[in-house]
Amino acid sequence: MVTTGLILLVAIAILAWGYRRALPYGSVGILAWLQSAVLMAPWLLFFGLFALGIYINLAGVLVLLLGSTGLYIYLGRRLRAIGQATLATSKNATAPETAPESELGISADESEVSGPTDRVTAAPPTAAPGQPTMAIPTEDLAQIEGIFGIDTYFRTETIPYDQGAIFRGNLRGQPAETQAQLSARLRDRLGDRYRLFLVENQEKKPTVVVLPATMDPAKTTPAQWVLALVLAVATFLTGLEAGAILQGFDLIQALSRWPAALPFLVGLLVVLISHEIGHWVLARRYGVRLSPPFLIPTWQIGSFGSLTRFESLLADRRVLFDIALAGPAAGGLVSLTMLLLGLVLSHPGSLFQLPSSFFQGSVLVGTLAKVVLGKALQEPLVDVHPLTIFGWLGLVITALNLMPAGQLDGGRVVQAIYGRKVAGRTTVITLILLALVSLGNPLALYWAALILILQRNLERPCLDDITEPDDARAALGLLALFLALAVLMPLTPSLAGRLGIGG
């Protein structure tokens, strides 16, 4: 109940903040805000009624989701219609053409910042229709246009874009080398005042975008540091509560028994800290600054993990992949090690007893348990070492963060391998699947709501957003996604029967 109330309050606060930001942009801003509100509405209604003890059946949930989807599509069409009308007016004017928001393959609803992450997006035009202006000073623009050449990138058109400019043209060399050469020339002429991005537009053609350095990712503010600290304290408390529930008592009603729940908290922190160390080590290797981790407390398993944003621009998609995968790899290896040690150390009389049917809840865990414990899984109750529980929950936390959605580690991995378009599609598919699974699992409902509210948008493009990671990284990414699926997917009754899992 407390978690539900907190989620509702956070969602309402985000909606109010988004509405305030949208007002200065008129109808375009309001329509973009309404799209976000429509996406959140079914979940807010579901959580609100749930908190009041009213449960919506399957038919009601489907009606809410279908209605929300229909409204979202309608608002998107209205938003595109307004954008096309503005673009047509601009084309007929004597001033330069204003770049549409879709130039970088970024949809209109991504123009707002959701959660603690900044990104490169097109803001609604601030000039009057038909009178677009170039935000870059004329002298600087002339210097920027001078960096292009027939040996790197042959510029054909310059278009105003937010606080910078888009330079359409033809790529004449390898993307990585060209981006490095153009960036070096830009620094030689204008110092560190501008950033050069090489991205694909909607037509899959290389496009150069130059933005002022003032649009770099913002550093963590003192208020955000305080929030990170508050969330860390809350995670300590929920970790203790989850450990208490696991042992059959309520920490709030039996506060003096908190030492009994402490081992669970320690196991949880080992997983979370190893995850963050993985991110930090690779980020340090590439010279990328990270924000402090914003831990996500939950009563069910102690924590969902953490949200960490980039405070530096990323050189290319290889860097995005390495930093994104390093956290789950470190946390997953630690969790898997604890699970295997726990299974090996399990014996009759171990501290915890689990119904053997529990091991049917995960393809990976159930299979490993069968290999190690053998016929013990045919008994109604299975004695297990505490490390088994810690490792299993650590794998669940890692798998949840590897879901291919938005700014989750899995979403970043997919974006790095396949690009923004595919990552956007996998985000929608993930949310739909979570919505269906949540009908029988409240944990999936909470996670879906958090993704929808805080993490649904993609990462901002890399400086070189065209060069793809190598095949080895692509294979590692697919393996990680497969293992995450194996952790979260339950065994079918027939397969569990063939494996001899369940009394």
Stretch-by-stretch model annotation:
Residues 1-503:
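Hydrophobic transmembrane alpha-helices and their immediate loop junctions
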